[in-house]
């Protein structure tokens, strides 16, 4: 028998580890390619393994999704609250993170790997038998792609700058029912499909569409009102060659596609794209000469006539957000002029707490969350698509460098559909992943980016939690790191993730988020 050497990890204090945990979470946000920015609620557990040249941290982080897309490349503290009338959502998560801090002059932090689980708790918080408003978190977002396409067409008709954009991924759909209205709030990412533009600046965007229907409406093809706002983000390269550290900033576009210069420049925190093949994601020394400040996006405001009309309106330049409002004409008559300036169709959604979160999906085969699925224990043996017991994934993670089935790094987005020569069956030969129609896993490779990065990290979206349920823990196994130790030994080596919590953890929840604490496991093994 072979004796595998292992050194005991040192429990450490969650409170003193928080600054490093914040940096690690920021790296996770910068690495991801879909979903919403995580903000740190608390450090739930912390261990370390120190050596002369580096210290490896093993962290458990309780997080909450913000309303900002990861495409914005913002720090979560720079994610301004949504000041519109649309509801916000409560989506919580927990991440198990391994990160290494090096003892160099920059105290460089490297993100080695992470696994996260997320779930919406909005319905559990807001829906009661006496509530006049009901919130539903729509798990299957794909049926709303057509609605997103139509909303984007409205937007494109008002601005030539967006003419070559197409819907990339429907991220989040929420239904709010109350009174005489049913509103659907649809968030989706978009991609610039102009080849001449894409090869110079791979531009992506993020849109929010509010679709309003009569409460009895069964046809979701033609909403009575549409409001849409979009932002565009450009991935431009700045920095030294050795570090390959382009900054990821926004490009403000006017209605003619030109940059807007009417707004003062405001510095933003920003991050780096994932490292190239074979590297981990890390911070590093600042760019030589600093980085030019980023200006906020120009998002003019306008109102839109019904689908099918040719009339357009100028964008008033004194506004800083794009809201295109669409109202179909009553029975064959076009409306005579736009609605009152700034008026939301039928007012805000009915009063009450809105639901929060991205469309949860069942986790695929792969390193699933720890423990049982959120809605009761699985039947005897491994469930077909739910999270198997901790430490026993049915197929294990995909081979190193290969994303799970259907989530490849290949440039197969709305602009370039997969060829017949390389379909899902070809990807499946390289890696075991979720079967078709179960796109539960969102890793950094998911999404249609033309970059070929080494895949690390996973985010599993689980079904919404109900009252009395707690968030299943993420998988604690990182076999890729342990395997890599034997071929590329590190000092200190990566150890198995600790199974016993530190006595000096967890942190207390901030009072602002105290209502979320009941959805996290209250105790850890000690």
From Swiss-Prot:
Known role: Plasma glycoprotein that binds a number of ligands such as heme, heparin, heparan sulfate, thrombospondin, plasminogen, and divalent metal ions. Inhibits rosette formation. Acts as an adapter protein and implicated in regulating many processes such as immune complex and pathogen clearance, cell adhesion, angiogenesis, coagulation and fibrinolysis. Mediates clearance of necrotic cells through enhancing the phagocytosis of necrotic cells in a heparan sulfate-dependent pathway. This process can be regulated by the presence of certain HRG ligands such as heparin and zinc ions.
GO cellular component, one term: blood microparticle
InterPro entries the record matches: Cystatin_dom, Cystatin_sf, Kininogen_Fetuin_HRG
Xref: SMART domains: CY (SM00043)
A Gene Ontology BP annotation from the UniProt entry: negative regulation of angiogenesis
Domain Cystatin residues, every copy: 9-126, 127-243
Domain notes: The His-rich (HRR) region contains approximately 12 tandem internal repeats of the 5-residue G[H/P][H/P]PH consensus sequence. HRR binds heparan sulfate and possesses antiangiogenic, antibacterial and antifungal properties through binding Candida cells, and preferentially lysing the ergosterol-containing liposomes at low pH. The tandem repeats also bind divalent metal ions and heme.
Keywords: Blood coagulation, Copper, Disulfide bond, Fibrinolysis, Glycoprotein, Hemostasis, Heparin-binding, Repeat, Secreted, Signal, Zinc
Location of region: Interaction with ATP5F1A: 31-74
Biased composition (Basic residues): 260-269, 328-346, 438-449
Modification(s) after translation: N-glycosylated.
Protein name: Histidine-rich glycoprotein
Disulfide bond entries: 14-505, 68-79, 95-116, 193-415, 207-230, 272-302
Name of the coding gene: HRG
Residues linked to a glycan: 115, 192, 240, 310, 485
Basic and acidic residues bias: start-end ranges: 408-429
Stretch forming the signal peptide: 1-8
Region Disordered: start-end pairs: 243-449
SUPFAM superfamilies: Cystatin/monellin (SSF54403)
Site residues, Cleavage: 303-304, 421-422
Subcellular location(s) per record: Secreted
């Amino acid at each position: 028998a072979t004796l595998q050497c292992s050194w005991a990890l040192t429990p450490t204090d969650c409170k003193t580890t928080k600054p490093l945990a914040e940096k690690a979470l920021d790296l996770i946000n910068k690495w991801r390619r879909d979903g919403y920015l995580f903000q740190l609620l608390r450090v739930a557990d912390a261990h370390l393994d120190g050596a002369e040249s580096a210290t490896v941290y093993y962290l458990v982080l309780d997080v909450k999704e913000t309303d900002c897309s990861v495409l914005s490349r913002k720090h979560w503290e720079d994610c301004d609250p949504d000041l519109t009338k649309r509801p916000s959502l409560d989506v919580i998560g927990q991440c198990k993170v391994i990160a290494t801090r090096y003892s160099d002059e920059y105290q460089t932090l490297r993100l080695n790997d992470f696994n996260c689980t997320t779930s919406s708790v909005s319905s559990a918080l807001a829906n009661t038998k006496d509530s006049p408003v009901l919130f539903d978190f729509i798990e299957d977002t794909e049926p709303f792609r057509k609605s997103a396409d139509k909303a984007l067409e409205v937007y494109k008709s008002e601005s030539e700058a967006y003419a070559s954009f197409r819907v990339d991924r429907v991220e989040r759909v929420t239904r709010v029912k109350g009174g005489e209205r049913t509103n659907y709030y649809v968030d989706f990412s978009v991609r610039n499909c102009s080849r001449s533009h894409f090869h110079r600046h791979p531009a992506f965007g993020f849109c929010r569409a509010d679709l309003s229907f009569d409460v009895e409406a069964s046809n979701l093809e033609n909403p009575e009102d549409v409001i849409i706002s979009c932002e565009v983000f450009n991935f431009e390269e700045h920095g030294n060659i050795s570090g390959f550290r382009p900054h990821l900033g926004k490009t403000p576009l006017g209605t003619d596609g030109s940059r807007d210069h009417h707004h003062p420049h405001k510095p933003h925190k920003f991050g780096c794209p994932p490292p190239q093949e074979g590297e981990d994601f890390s911070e590093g020394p600042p760019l030589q000469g600093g980085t030019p400040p980023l200006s906020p996006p120009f998002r003019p405001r306008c109102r839109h006539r019904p689908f099918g009309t040719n009339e357009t309106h100028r964008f008033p330049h004194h506004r800083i957000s794009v809201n295109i409002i669409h109202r179909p004409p009553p029975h064959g008559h076009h409306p005579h002029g736009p609605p009152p300036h700034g008026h939301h169709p039928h007012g805000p959604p009915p009063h009450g707490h809105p639901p929060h979160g991205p469309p949860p999906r069942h986790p695929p085969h792969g390193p699933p969350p720890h423990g049982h699925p959120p809605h009761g224990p699985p039947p005897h043996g491994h469930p077909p698509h739910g999270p198997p017991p901790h430490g026993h994934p049915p197929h294990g993670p995909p081979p190193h460098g290969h994303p799970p089935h259907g989530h490849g790094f290949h440039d197969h987005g709305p602009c370039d559909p997969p060829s017949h020569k390389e379909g899902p069956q070809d990807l499946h030969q390289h890696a075991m992943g979720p079967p078709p129609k179960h796109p539960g896993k969102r890793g950094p490779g998911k999404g249609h980016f033309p970059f070929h990065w080494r895949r690390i990290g996973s985010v599993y979206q689980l079904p919404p939690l109900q009252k009395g349920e707690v968030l299943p823990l993420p998988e604690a196994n990182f076999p890729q790191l342990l395997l890599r130790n034997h071929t590329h030994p590190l000092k200190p080596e990566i150890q198995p993730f600790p199974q016993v919590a530190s006595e000096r953890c967890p942190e207390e929840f901030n009072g602002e988020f105290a209502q979320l604490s009941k959805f996290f496991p209250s105790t850890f093994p000690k």
